[in-house]
Amino acid sequence: MHRTNLLVLSGDPHRAPMARYRSDLRRLRASDPAVRAMTDFLREPPLTAAEDCALDTALDDMFRLGVRAFLVVRDLTVVGLITAEAIRQARRSAATRIVEVMTAAADMPAIDWQTLQDSTIRDLMEIFEGARVDHLVVLESKTAQHASVRGVVHRSRVERRLHLSADPL
């Protein structure tokens, strides 16, 4: 899928950041619909970081919020994805910015909204394993060249809800 002009669809931006993860308490089964594992940005605003943010600041914010990734934005347009793992692996100084380390929007691991609706949790786990990724951005196509970021699926949250991992994040 050609990914230019990715816009963030978002719900109520004033909702408390940690309130969004209450859905993580519901147990999942491998046969459940994959959409049950998605953080839907129509209901819960995404956690984002500006591309010029310092890596250390982004990592501190991730730790404080209990997350492992942020969408990277410029003027409400998604330009990439930054993960805690990418930050930890980067050679960095206080001057290193997200834009230097992030995965560009065109290279973000993604799944189409329609495909997600037709998938199960088992299918998601196979995608995570096969692609060796920890996050899948959910894209909703508007036209052949334009898509919006509808949500995200986090591997660690799926595993936790499947009771496959004791990892607290």
Regions found by a protein language model. Give the residues of each.
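Tandem CBS (Cystathionine beta-synthase) repeat/Bateman regulatory domains
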Residues: M1-L169
